[in-house]
Amino acid sequence: MTKKRYAVCGVSARAIGMYIRPMMQSFSHCAELVAMLDIDPLRFQVCKDLVPEVQGKGIAEYTVTLENWKEVFDRMIEEQKVDAVLVVCKDCHHVDYIVRGLELGLDVISEKPMTTNIADARRVIEAEDNSKGKLICTFNYRYNPIHRKLRELIVDGKIGRVTHVDLTWYIDIKHGSSYFNRWNRMRENSGSLSIHKSSHHFDLVGWWIDGVPEYVHAFGALNHYGPNGEFNPSKKDGRHCLDCPEKLKCAYKKRWATRNSTIFVKDDHINAYETKVKQFSEYRPDMCIFDSEINIYDTFVVNVKYKNGALLNYSANFSTPYEGYHLAINGTRGRLETKEFGGAGGKGLPSTNEGGMRYIDYYPIFEGRERIHVPAGEGGHGGGDPLILEDIFLGEDPDRKFDILAKSVDGLRAISVGDAVFTSIEDGQVQDLTSFMR
């Protein structure tokens, strides 16, 4: 078998854990990592330390700047004879590597979000239209067993035509606050959490219901973070959690710290500054969650109208006692409900499992409830990560009854809703997506 030659753009924690390690350990028979590119040369050594299989393989390393990225990227593609690129860098730079990769005729795998705004998403669509390469957008949460089962039930017509979705998402104090420690807290970097985080959720809804978004309206606020956050020990900028003299006065951090140690909390989103090993040359992912530069929202409510007539009401809160969501999908013939709790603060909550399995409650419109149990999957995102990796590196499973691997149009739809949310919060208007939506 001829191996496909991959380059990784952005040696982030996500790149290492989600793509590089599996490529080296599970897919080396069909995928070959030939190059890594990053703005911080320290990330190459971090990758080697975390994935020993990378060492001694002759994998080329390319360090870029914001000014020379295109020149270095083009040289990497030519020198290493790259077939496909994995784009896992800071969100705001996705569009650069995606578009250039497509211009060079390469296949592109983009971590979500595909881009950070509608304009850049449309650039990606145009570039793909004119390229022999194709784009995959890695909305891995589709592959979660409970989410696949929901899609199956809707495709099978269990609730008839979908009329309304009610989705409330909770991001707990550990996970939620971490976004405000990192670069994600700036609109120009992440597009805002309505894109960086909620695009996951908007994609799920659109996929479940075959929905093309048309109109979006939202309200939002910065309630918990920034200088006016209720638990800010003092109004000052430039603090960092690791060496902050006010850590034990900070309600968000003192739970995980004592006067002589830090409690390590398992969290796949951020622990980089809670280790003795230096992970970055200059960037610090422990910036104060109360800094005044924060320019995104931590609470928002959203209404979306889809082309097929379905309606969505959605909310997200990034400072809750526990992690999880409540979901209800209503149709002309019935209703589906499910929920999930967990996270750093979720240990005291009622279990959403029965016999080790999560469940969906199905309510036929004129009959009694049926509880549908779904076996748990193995691996990240509820068992979704291993399955999407198989589709990426081995090709899509031909035996599935419905498409699941997200494409560029799915990225466009999810990002358009997320960007429209931020704009609607800012200007108070309903956002019309119909002129460009596919």
Enumerate the predicted regions with their spans.
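N-terminal glycine-/serine-/threonine-rich beta1-alpha1-beta2 phosphate-ribose binding loop
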Residues: 1-104, 122, 126-132, 393
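Catalytic cores of eukaryotic secretory-pathway lumenal/extracellular enzymes that build
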Residues: 13, 31, 91, 95, ...
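C-terminal helical cap and adjacent loop that interface with cofactors, partners, or active-site loops
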Residues: 18, 296-438
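Rossmann-fold dehydrogenase core element
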Residues: 123-140, 161-164
